[in-house]
Swiss-Prot record:
Organism: Caulobacter sp. (strain K31)
Signal peptide bounds: none
Molecular functions (GO terms): 4 iron, 4 sulfur cluster binding; iron ion binding; NADH dehydrogenase (ubiquinone) activity; NADH:ubiquinone reductase (non-electrogenic) activity; quinone binding
Source organism phylogeny: Bacteria, Pseudomonadati, Pseudomonadota, Alphaproteobacteria, Caulobacterales
EC top class named in words: translocase
Pfam families: Oxidored_q6 (PF01058)
Family matches, as NCBIfam families: nuoB_fam (TIGR01957), PRK06411.1 (NF005012)
Record's protein name: NADH-quinone oxidoreductase subunit B
EC assignment: 7.1.1.-
InterPro entries for this protein: NADH_UbQ_OxRdtase-like_20kDa (IPR006137), NADH_UQ_OxRdtase_20Kd_su (IPR006138)
The UniProt record lists the keyword Nucleus: no
Keyword line: 4Fe-4S, Cell inner membrane, Cell membrane, Iron, Iron-sulfur, Membrane, Metal-binding, NAD, Quinone, Translocase, Transport, Ubiquinone
Cofactor note text: Binds 1 [4Fe-4S] cluster.
GO cellular component, one term: plasma membrane
Length: 196
């Protein structure tokens, strides 16, 4: 950009921190902005340290380091895999995959749950340490979906394990799952207990 000698060049230092300049940051979405972190960052900027209860600190740490285990049963599992790939990248929200239920905090049930698979789902859920959370992904996992009247389908995985977040769709998009994960993080922050 060529600036005439008599005019002032636009300066980003004239914009106060945290105002309109924030919207120009790549990847910032005001809909996903959390006022909880505004309070912490304001307190940190004023004093140089943060005072909080141990429960608040543990809850804050838990929301940023959730380990999820896949329980992909049908076509929804493909969209679940998309959400972990570079385009959506769930790990940037502190949501990393694990292969074992013993190291997982969250289980994503994606797809049609059959009667034969229901005991395995419950067994895997019981192996997860407390506090544990479950996301039901897709119409089939939520309520039976297209196969509702089949003799071999469980009409919703909430009959087997308690569900925290329902992600609707057939199949739901990867964006819907990312939104469900963000809602789970907000729910954990809101309830904020060490034991569930």
């Amino acid at each position: 950009m060529i600036v005439p000698p008599n005019s002032a060049a636009p300066s980003s230092s004239l914009v106060p921190a945290g105002s309109a300049a924030r919207s120009t940051v790549q990847g910032y979405d005001p809909k996903l902005h959390d006022p909880y972190f505004d309070g912490l960052s304001g307190q940190l900027a004023d004093k140089g340290f943060v005072t909080a209860a141990a429960d608040d600190l543990i809850t804050w740490a838990r929301t940023g380091s959730l380990m999820w285990m896949t329980f992909g049963l049908a076509c929804c599992a493909v969209e679940m895999m998309h959400s972990a790939m570079p385009r959506y990248d769930l790990e940037r929200y502190g949501f990393a995959p694990r292969a074992s239920p013993r190291q997982s905090d969250v289980m994503i049930v994606a797809g049609t749950l059959t009667n034969k698979m229901a005991p395995a789902l419950r067994k895997v859920y019981d192996q997860m340490p407390e506090p544990r959370y479950v996301i039901s992904m897709g119409s089939c996992a939520n309520g039976g979906g297209y196969y509702y009247y089949s003799y071999s389908v469980v009409r919703g995985c909430d009959r087997i394990v308690p569900i925290d977040i329902y992600v609707p769709g057939c199949p739901p998009t990867a964006e819907a799952l990312v939104y469900g994960v963000l809602q789970l993080q907000k729910k954990i922050r809101r309830t904020g207990t060490i034991e569930r």
